[in-house]
Amino acid sequence: MKSISCSKEYSEDVRNLNIRPEQLDDFVGQKDLIQNLKVFINAAQTRAEALDHVLLYGPPGLGKTTLAQIVSKELRVSFRATSGPLLSKAGDLAAVLTTLNAKDVLFIDEIHRLNRSIEEVLYTAMEDFCLDILVGEGPSTRTLRIDLPPFTLIGATTRLGLLSAPLRDRFGIPLHLEFYSFEELVDIIKRGARVLCAEIEKDAVQEIACRARGTPRIALRLLRRIRDFVEVKDDKKITCEIAGSALSKLGIDKMGLNKLDMDYLRFLFNTSGPVGIDTISIALSEDVGNIEETVEPYLIKVSFVKRTPRGRVLTDQAREYLSINSVVC
């Protein structure tokens, strides 16, 4: 079986990691955000200070983790990463914060999932660079203050509305990541193909970009899966025909919609009036959070669904799409 990949001396994991850009100048998309971030980083370096705390928010797969890593590289400081669900008690947070050196970057993914007791400990760490820890029990309880070096907290969330106002307001640099344009996705897919040493036709790149939902993570995942089909079929190049066939087998339609998206749309189509998210969740046997994070943002972006105070409503554009593609039942 022939392979369209480069020599096997490089592991698959290494190649996949290299798909991510390592500096702001190589980051495709989010142009205004990147320009502003460059200004903030340069200003912090000029003052020899830690960068102000950064909050990255937007739908999944748009590059929040990658941006956080790039920021630490641009600042030439260490990068520590954790996530909201892993910080279940104050001691967990203290263990992370006390290992930081001056100006280091601490990245907390899914920061909206921090419980309130952890948030309260984080407030003083972010504002005053210190930790107040309760020592002892009962009447002998006392507060022990631990000083921390100035550091940069970068929080990432797909659910900005779930962050408490006090925590949200402590981020001096809130940055909203938006869906990527078709042209930006084309550039990202081309770069990914080069890193993976996969030969791909221009039309195939465009086919993937059309079905990637404006999301780099999805675009690169589809590229890797299509490459699998090509290698197994003993082909040398990813053509538009092969890409289209592979994507159809993966259940991805021309708009980038998958089975869950179509089930969601069909349910709204067959239900009269606005529908609440809890009702949709029960009907589809899907978690509310998953629907709100991974399904609805793109459907709203392409004007297939509207959110109203009374619930979700299917648009005429979506009804026409479902009818044309004969997927209503």
From Swiss-Prot:
Q: What is this protein called?
A: Holliday junction branch migration complex subunit RuvB
Q: What positions does the entry give for Mg(2+) binding? A: T65
Name a GO molecular-function annotation. ATP hydrolysis activity
Q: Which superkingdom, per the lineage?
A: Bacteria
Binding of DNA: at which residues? R307, R312
Instruction: Tell me how this protein assembles.
Output: Homohexamer. Forms an RuvA(8)-RuvB(12)-Holliday junction (HJ) complex. HJ DNA is sandwiched between 2 RuvA tetramers; dsDNA enters through RuvA and exits via RuvB. An RuvB hexamer assembles on each DNA strand where it exits the tetramer. Each RuvB hexamer is contacted by two RuvA subunits (via domain III) on 2 adjacent RuvB subunits; this complex drives branch migration. In the full resolvosome a probable DNA-RuvA(4)-RuvB(12)-RuvC(2) complex forms which resolves the HJ.
- UniProt region (Large ATPase domain (RuvB-L)), positions on chain: 1-180
| Major localization class | cytoplasm
The record comments on the domains as follows:
Has 3 domains, the large (RuvB-L) and small ATPase (RuvB-S) domains and the C-terminal head (RuvB-H) domain. The head domain binds DNA, while the ATPase domains jointly bind ATP, ADP or are empty depending on the state of the subunit in the translocation cycle. During a single DNA translocation step the structure of each domain remains the same, but their relative positions change.
Record region (Small ATPAse domain (RuvB-S)): 181-251
- Where is this protein localized, as stated in its record? Cytoplasm
**Which terms does the UniProt entry file under GO BP?**
DNA recombination; DNA repair
For this protein, the record's CDD domains field holds: AAA (cd00009)
Its family remark reads: Belongs to the RuvB family.
Q: Which UniProt keywords apply?
A: ATP-binding, Cytoplasm, DNA damage, DNA recombination, DNA repair, DNA-binding, Hydrolase, Nucleotide-binding
Query: So where does ATP get bound?
Result: I19, R20, G61, K64, T65, T66, E127, D128, F129, R170, Y180, R217
Q: Which GO terms describe its cellular component?
A: cytoplasm; Holliday junction resolvase complex
Region feature Head domain (RuvB-H), mapped onto this chain:
254-329
Catalytic activity from the UniProt record: ATP + H2O = ADP + phosphate + H(+)
EC number(s) on file: 3.6.4.-
